[in-house]
């Protein structure tokens, strides 16, 4: 009887759990598929720059920093 219980538990509970596709894997795969289709130049353009708290003198302001007051 114990062997039958172990066999049923294995095939009715554990086997279906291993064959299920996890939902958390899908967004990563979709994101990777989208990024894979991009050209290298387009991939480089997607990078977001971290905000910086730098300031520079008004004559040196070129958009990379905020002008100091």
From Swiss-Prot:
Modified residues (4-hydroxyproline): 58
Modified residues (4-carboxyglutamate): 54, 57
Cystine bridges: 55-67, 56-65, 61-68
Pro-sequence residue ranges: 21-52
Major place of residence: secreted
A Pfam family: Conotoxin
GO biological process, one term: envenomation resulting in positive regulation of voltage-gated sodium channel activity in another organism
Compartments (UniProt record): Secreted
Name by which UniProt lists this protein: Iota-conotoxin LtIIIA
Taxonomic source organism: Conus litteratus (Lettered cone)
